[in-house]
């Protein structure tokens, strides 16, 4: 099965050790970056919830879980021992949801456009093609994260999180009630949860 393919791939790659390579440092650097992003997004989710943005809170939480998986893939290539790295990380504050989205989008942009392509090139140079491929594939996910954050930034800036130009179908995240109109109901008539729980209905199945 697929699991065996991955195990075999890892065995083949790990015939060559990452110990002492630039790739080893890059793996640890990006593991730390993904781990910190996961924590920041968890904090940002709490703020979004408090500010009445249930969908944005859920997206921050979902993205945090995805960063956890990226971190795990990176960590699994490492071989133990202590490794010293020099890297810069956001020593930022927890802001408003708009500020948090902007911070998150900028971080994702840096990863997919600069950091991970660079790490992939180094991995290729050092003879770790599977690690290079991992970085390039994770960069695709990070680009998707950035685009999603930018869409929410636009919604907040144009006050269109719960109101749209034309009629749309809104769905309550709590109970599934469906409503068609330009603006989400102030209160869900079915479960009495506030407007915060409404989002534009998605059909992706």
What positions do the PLM features span?
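Non-heme di-metal
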Residues: 10-205
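Short, small-residue-biased leader/transition segments that mark boundaries at the very start
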Residues: 1-6
């Amino acid at each position: 099965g697929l699991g065996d393919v991955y195990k075999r791939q890892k065995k083949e790659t790990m015939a060559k050790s990452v110990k002492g390579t630039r790739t080893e440092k890059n793996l640890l650097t990006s593991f730390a970056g993904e781990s910190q992003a996961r924590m920041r997004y968890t904090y940002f989710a709490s703020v979004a919830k408090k500010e009445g943005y249930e969908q944005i809170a859920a997206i921050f939480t979902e993205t945090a879980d995805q960063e956890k998986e990226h971190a795990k893939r990176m960590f699994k290539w490492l071989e133990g021992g202590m490794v010293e790295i020099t890297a810069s990380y956001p020593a930022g504050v927890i802001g408003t949801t708009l500020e948090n989205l902007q911070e998150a989008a900028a971080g994702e942009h840096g990863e997919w456009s600069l950091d991970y392509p660079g790490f992939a090139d180094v991995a290729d140079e050092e003879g770790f093609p599977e690690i290079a491929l991992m970085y390039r594939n994770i960069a695709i996910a990070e680009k998707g994260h950035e685009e999603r954050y930018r869409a929410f930034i636009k919604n907040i800036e144009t006050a269109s999180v719960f109101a749209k130009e034309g009629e749309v179908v809104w769905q309550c995240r709590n109970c599934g009630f469906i409503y068609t109109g330009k603006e989400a109901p102030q209160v869900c008539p079915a479960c009495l949860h506030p407007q915060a729980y409404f989002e534009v209905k998605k059909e992706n199945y």
